[in-house]
């Protein structure tokens, strides 16, 4: 819709949803800019260009956030890349309605990619749209700073991998040469594996309460030939016993 102020002056153009708590999502303040397929292609190109040409993420990893909603100018859309798997999450009915244009733009940026799309039930209710997610895709093995990790979107553990901790994992590995490392709430073992495989730690233990996520952590350690001991335990009694 076009947006005007109380004097009738044009101020912008965007998604309107009378059923949502966020009734209006402004996408452009340029009167000449149409919100058509070319607009979505341009926005995706700009976002991908920022990651590839400015941040140069492809030199470090093939797992990174492609579209970060308002931060990249497409309100209600989050897109993540895990190797050849592109994960699309809809937070607005407007983004969902234009999903085919979005998919086409993403295919241009990532030829041959697989898609997994979803929207949380509470989002669908708030935004008044219906979308049944497909079956979870086969896991993707991604590379980050020379290490490999499994990402499993659609599983009970989000993706099983937190790409936003990339720099923190690498930073930790600078201090673990010959050290004994305890990774508390280790999830899928990212920090623990960095400490051992990249940082040269002498001994690494990872603790988590979730037995299923520890199975993923063990597979990640195997992928990197990293000897890490994973323990299924509540951290508080574990720490008391270890003291």
What are these regions (language model features)?
Residues 134-243:
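Rossmann-like S-adenosyl-L-methionine
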Residues 67-80, 96-162, 170:
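Non-catalytic substrate-recognition/targeting regions of SAM-dependent transferases
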Residues 38-58, 111-127, 173-199, 209:
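A short, charged
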Residues 1-83, 137:
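Non-catalytic accessory regions of SAM-dependent methyltransferases
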Residues 47, 105-109, 220:
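Conserved short hydrophobic interaction patches
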Residues 85-90:
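Carbohydrate-binding surface patches
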Residues 36-43, 94, 98-102:
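Short amphipathic alpha-helical segments
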């Amino acid at each position: 819709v076009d947006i005007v102020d109380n004097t009738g002056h044009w101020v912008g153009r965007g998604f309107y949803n009378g059923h949502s708590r966020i009734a209006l999502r402004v996408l452009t303040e340029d009167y000449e800019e149409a919100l058509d397929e070319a607009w979505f292609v341009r926005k995706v190109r700009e976002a991908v260009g920022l990651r590839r040409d400015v941040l140069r993420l492809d030199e470090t990893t093939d797992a990174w956030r492609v579209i970060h909603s308002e931060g990249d100018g497409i309100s209600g859309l989050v897109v993540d890349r895990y190797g050849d798997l592109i994960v699309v999450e809809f937070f607005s009915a407007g983004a969902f309605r234009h999903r085919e244009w979005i998919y086409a733009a993403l295919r241009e940026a990532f030829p041959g990619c697989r898609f997994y799309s979803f929207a949380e039930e509470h989002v669908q209710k708030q935004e008044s749209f219906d979308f049944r997610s497909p079956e979870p895709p086969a896991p993707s093995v991604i590379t980050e700073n020379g290490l490999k990790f499994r990402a499993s979107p659609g599983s009970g553990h989000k993706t099983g991998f937190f790409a936003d901790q990339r720099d923190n994992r690498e930073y930790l590995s600078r201090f673990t040469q010959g050290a004994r490392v305890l990774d508390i709430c280790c999830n899928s073992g990212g920090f623990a594996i960095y400490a051992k495989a990249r940082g040269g730690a002498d001994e690494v233990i990872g603790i988590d309460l979730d037995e299923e996520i520890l199975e993923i952590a063990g597979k990640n350690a195997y992928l990197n030939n990293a000897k890490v001991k994973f323990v299924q335990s509540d951290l508080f009694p574990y720490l008391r016993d270890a003291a």
